[in-house]
């Protein structure tokens, strides 16, 4: 017997009993985004490698170690997208989306990073992200954070907390970087291998170290907040004031720097303690120089992304599940081939009807067991007599209503009257 083929490590299947919760999450997020004026954009999952090295940063972990990169038959270097923002910007430049407007877009789909799989971290993972272009003031920063707070509330998540920081302008970061490198060089004997590697290429990321032996050193490091220009400082204070007035709790975390080089000014994360080290549920920030960096005209921008696997895991732990949309009715037939045209006619009359049948047939006993397990409220019976007459027997599976026999038109009227109570009770199959 041939050896079975299994999924790749870090790539997971999402099974039918799991998808209702995913659909619940996705539909609620989509409704919230569209209520704030965002429109969906659909992007390729493969882009030129240069797009990510120019946007994310050549010395970031993502570009150095985590991207799935390959050469195609033309010799071009291509990469499975590790995140969505760079592709969104590329699309906006290529298709003229930034000309004379302030587009708001959202996207959803799989991303790919060659990381070590663990709870909350996968090599293929699903993100939903949203981006706003052309708005530079603190109002859009505050609105986006308030929108993410509403989005998480709509999903029923309560034990998440908000952390904020500002990364200032490029000039402020350059001044802070010089002071930070000088400080770290003076304590180089206390740096771990990863920090030594980053010292001259990306020292800001050292502040985000997870090494407990370096926490005290990092706590005493120069703070970016002390190097901010006045515009960045007042911008951040305005964002915080709006959150205060709206009653959204937050903590300013000066070590919050995000893992992508393109961020500037406001950055934020919603985090939880329930996912171990992978505690970030949703994160984002402003990236005012990225559009120009990729080849467009200077365009301010802000965005966020959330990981669906982490969000779904949190909801499952909280006992939240999506609606199980089983059939309204289950067809029990003596001959499925003769029954199918009658069933299709019923679907034509009631397009919203969820109707399931066992096309392989089987005994009435086994079909009724299957009907009961499906969660359907009704069984529509097509025995030999019903098939000969072109009528349906109607049996109530959840109540004690008397069984009756109806022609297709009368059955359509009957189902329409009972529509509010026909939702499936529970799918147990």
Curated annotation (Swiss-Prot):
It comes from the Bacteria. The gene is hisS. Belongs to the class-II aminoacyl-tRNA synthetase family. Homodimer. Transmembrane segments: none annotated. The keyword NAD does not apply. It comes from Alkalilimnicola ehrlichii (strain ATCC BAA-1101 / DSM 17681 / MLHE-1). This is Histidine--tRNA ligase. One of its GO terms (cellular component) is cytoplasm. GO terms for molecular function: ATP binding; histidine-tRNA ligase activity.
């Amino acid at each position: 017997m041939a050896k079975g083929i299994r999924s790749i490590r870090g790539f997971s299947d999402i099974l039918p009993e799991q998808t209702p919760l995913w659909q619940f999450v996705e539909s609620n997020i989509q409704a919230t985004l569209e209520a704030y004026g965002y429109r969906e954009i659909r992007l390729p999952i493969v882009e030129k490698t240069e797009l990510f090295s120019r946007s994310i940063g050549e010395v970031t972990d993502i570009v150095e170690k985590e991207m799935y990169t390959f050469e195609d038959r033309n010799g071009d270097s291509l990469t499975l997208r590790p995140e969505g923002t760079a592709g969104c910007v590329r699309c906006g430049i290529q298709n003229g989306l930034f000309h004379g407007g302030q587009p708001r877009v959202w996207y959803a789909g799989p991303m790919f990073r060659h990381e070590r799989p663990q709870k909350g971290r996968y090599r293929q993972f699903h993100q939903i992200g949203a981006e706003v272009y052309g708005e530079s003031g603190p109002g859009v920063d505050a609105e986006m954070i308030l929108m993410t707070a509403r989005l998480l509330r709509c999903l029923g998540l309560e034990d998440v907390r908000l952390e904020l920081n500002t990364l200032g302008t490029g000039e402020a970061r350059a001044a802070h970087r010089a002071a930070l490198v000088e400080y770290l060089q003076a304590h180089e004997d206390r740096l771990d291998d990863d920090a030594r590697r980053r010292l001259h290429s990306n020292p800001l990321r050292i502040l985000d170290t997870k090494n407990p032996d370096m926490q005290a050193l990092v706590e005493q490091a120069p703070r970016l907040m002390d190097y901010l220009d006045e515009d960045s400082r007042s911008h951040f204070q305005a964002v915080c004031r709006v959150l205060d007035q709206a009653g959204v709790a937050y903590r300013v975390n000066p070590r919050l720097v995000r893992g992508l080089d393109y961020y500037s000014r406001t950055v934020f994360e919603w985090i939880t303690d329930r996912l171990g080290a992978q505690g970030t549920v949703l994160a984002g920030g402003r990236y005012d120089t990225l559009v120009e960096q990729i080849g467009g005209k200077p365009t301010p921008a802000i965005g966020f992304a959330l990981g669906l696997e982490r969000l779904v895991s949190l909801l499952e732990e909280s006992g939240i599940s999506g609606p199980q949309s089983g059939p309204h009715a289950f067809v029990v037939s003596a001959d499925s081939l003769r029954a199918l045209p009658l069933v299709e006619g019923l679907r034509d009359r009631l397009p919203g009807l969820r109707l399931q049948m066992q096309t392989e047939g089987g005994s009435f006993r086994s079909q009724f067991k299957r009907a009961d397990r499906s969660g359907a409220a009704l069984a529509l019976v097509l025995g030999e007599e019903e098939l000969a007459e072109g009528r349906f027997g109607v049996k109530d599976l959840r109540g004690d209503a008397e069984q009756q026999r109806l022609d297709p038109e009368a059955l359509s009227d009957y189902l329409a009257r009972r529509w509010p109570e026909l939702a499936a009770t529970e799918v147990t199959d």
